[in-house]
Amino acid sequence: MGRLLAIDGLNIVRRVYEASPEPDSDLKAEIALRHALSSFRNLITDHQPTHVLPAFDFGGATWRHQLYAGYREGRAPMPGVLREALPEFYQRLAGFGLRVVSLPDVEADDVIGTVVLRWLAEDRGAAVVATTDKDLHCLVAQGALVWDHFKSEWHDHAWCEKKWGVPPEQLPDLLALMGDATDSIPGVSKVGLKTAAKLLRTYGTLDAIMAGAGILKDTLGETLRKEREMLYLSRQLVQLKTDVRVGVSWNMLAWESA
């Protein structure tokens, strides 16, 4: 059986870059990408994959911006020196034997979701996603495992339930309810993690919650009814797009160990 390692590329690159307190500079970018390359190598050494998917955001507007103009409006842009250094970094990854996938109009999350689900559907073996991004943890429900490279820990079904109070299959509904400030996804006013998790444990799904909201006489019921449209828009925004035309074959992602 095979083993797919999907790497959320910018999740690693940006965290390494931002961990350094120095001001933005070409030297800072060079050092950060050198460390990021070591992280990629360590991931491959530690997980011994048969296939590797290094996925990176292409940049610019995506299908989510078309749905909601305010998407990610509060997120700080990538430092220019780091963005300018990425093409050379991709070349270094290619020289290392990796096939970088970076597609316009979609995010790396969508590419990873598409490829991981296809891999699992074809029963090709284990799928590991190297990321700290909460959006990708919904893939745990389909049989993937998430690896936090920075904490060296596995995130499985039990970890997700302990962290968020719901199983991974309910994570998109949870994020839709509570919103996600990182991506400027509004969610429902004054609904935080605990309230969102309690609603999902009680009702099970977003649709069931909204059906029940019709008889709730308290402020929460009123808010849910009032913000129904934004809630379902938020649900679309947090949902992974899993039908991306990735344009690579399994052979292109195959990893030949030295």
PLM feature spans:
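Noncatalytic, basic helical substrate-engagement surface that gates or grips nucleic-acid strands
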Residues: 2-130, 136-153, 229-233, 239-257
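Non-catalytic nucleic-acid-binding/docking modules located in mid-to-C-terminal regions
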Residues: 49-53, 143, 155-258
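Acidic, divalent-metal-coordinating active-site segment for phosphoryl/phosphodiester hydrolysis
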Residues: 134-135, 194
